[in-house]
UniProtKB/Swiss-Prot annotation:
Sequence similarity: Belongs to the class-II aminoacyl-tRNA synthetase family.
GO molecular function, one term: ATP binding
Annotated GO biological process: histidyl-tRNA aminoacylation
The protein, known as: Histidine--tRNA ligase
PROSITE patterns: AA_TRNA_LIGASE_II
Catalytic activity field: tRNA(His) + L-histidine + ATP = L-histidyl-tRNA(His) + AMP + diphosphate + H(+)
Length: 423
């Protein structure tokens, strides 16, 4: 074992892994651009109170999972455990809401002190979308459709959209009273975690993963029975919009999400391939959060995708791209200088070139070239310099069937070389 290792739950992404990540990130950016979204980037570190107030003191995230410390100015700081609170803080701080509705996306690392397992790390990555100032139920439908279409375009087949309505704050207050009464009557039948949550965050009991408690909850009062007529109408309109968009969904009356700021729409996109960590994307509406964090009353909705879980699902379907177009083999002082000059010119034409600086014999350099997964090798030694030639050798089989394995270009035939490398 080497002297220095990554911390538990902190994972290095090595070059062959980052290729897969880049494919996903680039496709996501394309979807976001097509949907008229603008990127926002926020710091990894925020004042702890932002998350305590925004996410909720009684949540597991704030109570158990945050990386929190005092800085040298005795301020309590926290590595962001999720993206929404930071985006809201930024939107309020910089007055973006004065410019009208905002349609934003973000991406980057988040931190939670959880037990690491497949698809869940202590440093993890999310990409998310947030709409501000859009109260329409059709904004909810559009937001869900952006996530659904992205996951479909990535080739995921085993997906399920689960949908619920949490109603208004007043709806939930009425429901809390009835739910607490029922939970107290069944206290001894609940699992230990659920018993601990009764007085802290009873709604989270509905989202338990304990099977015996799940069975018990089938007889619990339903939140949907306590929704106001307006909340029920809103939820029906969302379902109709999703039917119109041909996005299939299941109603899950126990879906409450893990953060306190949600209201009305709550949803998750899951995959059975992920086992216990089934959620790929989750989100909902949070109309009170902006005001709660010092901004104006602003209807808002958003979602986040867990990148690690997404990559697990895509490992077999995302194929390795050609990472290098050309591996440049050279030996000798003058060939090395000429090789560097030619490499710069080729890169200016968006040709990916890896230049060998080893000055090893050609046999060893060819072995490296084959390992590089390059399509071509350029060979430049003293003979090529003397003849004024650039020698090109194919390292992979011909796609168009032209049949040549090796060809020489005169130094004056640079354009022909570029054309060959690009085709």
């Amino acid at each position: 074992m080497t002297e220095f290792q990554t911390l538990r739950g902190m994972v290095d992404l090595l070059p062959m892994q980052t290729q897969r990540w880049q494919i996903v990130e680039n496709l996501a950016r394309h979807h976001f651009h097509r949907a008229g979204l603008k990127e926002i980037r926020t710091p990894l570190l925020e004042i702890t109170e932002l998350f305590a107030r925004g996410i909720g003191e009684a949540t597991d995230v704030v109570g158990k999972e945050m990386y929190t410390f005092l800085d040298r100015g005795d301020r309590s700081c926290t590595l962001r455990p999720e993206g929404t609170a930071s985006v809201v803080r930024s939107v309020v701080q910089h007055g973006l809401l004065n410019q009208g509705p905002q349609r934003l996306w973000y991406g980057g690392p988040m931190f939670r002190y959880e037990r690491p397992q497949a698809g869940r790390q202590r440093q993890f990555h999310q990409m998310g979308v947030e709409f501000f100032g859009l109260p329409s139920i059709h904004a909810d439908a559009e937001l869900i459709s952006i996530a659904w279409d992205l996951l479909q375009d990535l080739g995921l087949k085993d997906l399920k959209l689960e949908l619920n309505s949490l109603g208004t704050f007043e709806d939930r207050q009425n429901y809390h009273a009835r739910l607490n009464e029922w939970l107290e009557c069944n206290f001894k039948l609940l699992d230990k975690d659920s018993q601990d949550r009764i007085h802290k965050n009873p709604l989270r009991i509905l989202d338990t993963k304990n099977q015996s408690t799940q069975e018990l909850l089938k007889d619990a009062p339903l939140l949907t029975d306590y929704l106001s007529d307006l909340s029920k109408e809103r939820f029906l309109c969302l379902q109709e919009a999703l039917h119109k968009l041909k996005i299939p969904f299941d109603l899950n009356h126990n879906l409450v999400r893990g953060l306190d700021y949600y209201c009305h729409t709550a949803f998750e996109i899951t995959s059975s391939q992920l086992g216990a960590q089934a959620t790929v994307c989750g989100g909902g509406r949070y109309d009170r959060l902006v005001k709660q964090l010092g901004g104006p009353d602003t209807p808002s909705i958003g979602w986040a995708i867990g990148m690690e879980r997404l990559i697990i699902l895509l490992e077999d379907s995302i194929h390795k791209e050609q990472f290098v177009d050309v591996y440049f083999i050279n030996r000798g002082e003058l060939p090395a200088i000429e090789a560097l000059s030619l490499t710069r010119k080729l890169r200016a034409f968006n040709i990916i070139v890896e230049l060998d600086h080893s000055q090893a014999n050609f046999s060893k350099q060819f072995k490296r070239a084959n390992r590089s997964n390059a399509k071509w090798a350029i060979i430049m030694g003293e003979d090529e310099i003397a003849k004024g030639e650039i020698r090109l050798k194919r390292l992979t089989s011909s796609i168009n069937g032209d049949g040549f394995d090796e060809i020489c270009f005169r130094n004056s035939e640079f354009n022909e070389l570029v054309h060959t490398l690009k085709n």
